[in-house]
């Protein structure tokens, strides 16, 4: 049947046919016709029917809440080897305090408490309320 057609022409013919079928195969794949294509992805019509949009909104809110909690925890946490120091006045005397609640975590090494912070060799700077 193909005795007078060379092999190159035959390969070229089948290649052109395959290229011509690609858009049709993609259409079948993308629209899940005949049950093929896009495994694991929900179709748009079933997505709305199952009311998944509210589930997504709840998931987004939960994600934002977790990120906010992580950010707040990071702000409260101190890096190792660093002390966050603040000043406050008691009876018109400045005390340095670390970022530690004395009732919950008393006498932690490396943190300054009211008992260990005063007196220092330096005097507080009245203009900026900081220790020199």
Curated annotation (Swiss-Prot):
Subcellular location: Membrane
Transmembrane segments: 10-30
One Gene Ontology cellular component: membrane
Taxonomy, superkingdom: Viruses
Keywords: Coiled coil, Membrane, Transmembrane, Transmembrane helix
Positions in coiled-coil regions: 50-79
Its membrane topology: Single-pass membrane protein
Name the UniProt record assigns to this protein: Uncharacterized protein 169L
Organism listed in the record: Invertebrate iridescent virus 6 (IIV-6)
Lineage: Viruses, Varidnaviria, Bamfordvirae, Nucleocytoviricota, Megaviricetes
